[in-house]
Amino acid sequence: MITNNVRVPHISKRCGIASSRSFNEKWVPRPFDFVRRTGGRRQSWIVGVLFAFFVISLFVTGTSAQKNPFTTSNPSWVQPLPPFKIAGNLYYVGSQDLAAYLIVTPQGNILINSNLESSPPQIRQAIESLGFKYADTKILLISHGHFDHCAGSAQIKRETHAKYEVMAEDVPVVESGGRNDFHYADRKSFWFPQTKVDRVLHDGHTVSLGGTTLTAHLTAGHTKGTTTWTLDEQDNGRTLHVVIVGSPNVNPGYKLVNNKTYPQIAADYRHQFEVLNKLPCDIFLGAHGGYFDLSQKLLLKSGQKNPFIDPVGYKAYIAERQQAFESELKKQSAERH
């Protein structure tokens, strides 16, 4: 999801809109004090120059995500969050608001979402701090083809050799690095590294590894290939239905009426809500922490009940997003008359 009114870490209920708080500034390297002497100090000077270049490179890499206006206004997208177990073999390895999920199996692991171009080191650290191997990532999936969920895919695929599996309607977007997006194609700040897809998915396709099976549900609208993932988890003898919502949100500037680059956008949104309303849900998750009140649920995690088991919250969130869509559609339709 890309939205210009999401500010976390304190997330308001259900809609993913949040209040802004202070953000710890990143460390900025001090200007390097070059050694000016020659002779015996020449080697020190060379080493110093190389060190300065290395530090500056780290700084540039670390701030590359900030080139996009959405990342500067949403610091929670890059703020680390200690990884944790959700249930069974399902773990959270994302940031404070950009969700990424690791599914661990005896035959390797499945990662959902690569997030920003700057996110892979953070995701890797989260995976390894849980005691798992980053190199064991065998399959990489995404929620949808926006830069805040798939810009890190090229690096993760290169480093782990994971098989990249994407819904067919979003394949042209991820393989073009966002240049074929129906709304953001002409905005270079929304482009990301082009990544070759290894398997093209369609609605209802399954992804299986090591005894775990996920089902891909096409829930288009936010993008043409937005994907909601479902799987079952065993937790304390119970079978829990997990739903990872792709995105039901209408971004600022989206045309729901007479959209020349996406004529069926309104129909796709309506179909999405039909699908989401029918899915059985015990554990409610999504592409952004704001969807499922991540910050609030973490405060309850030490209790006896698993706060991520939230079927009521799921139904409320989907109903709210559906109402928001219908209101926006009605508004845009009225403006055309």
PLM regions and their residue ranges:
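Intrinsic disorder/low-complexity segments
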Residues: M1-Q66, R158
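Accessory terminal helices/loops
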Residues: L50, G62-S76, N236, V250-H337
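Metallo-beta-lactamase
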Residues: K67-T71, Q79-L81, K85-A87, D136, ...
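Conserved beta-strand hairpin/beta-sheet module of binuclear metal-dependent hydrolase folds
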Residues: P75-L130, Y134, T228-V250
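Loop/turn elements at helix/coil->beta-strand transitions in domains of secreted/extracellular proteins
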Residues: G108, D136-K138, T160-K163, T212-L214, ...
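Active-site neighborhood of phospho(di)ester-bond hydrolases with catalytic His/Asp-centered motifs
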Residues: I112-S114, T137-G145, Y164-M167, L218-G221, ...
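Active-site HxH/HxHxD metal-binding segment of metal-dependent hydrolases
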Residues: S118-P121, E128-T206, G303, I309, ...
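Active-site environment of divalent metal-dependent phosphoester hydrolases
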Residues: S119, G145-A151, V171-V174, K224-T227, ...
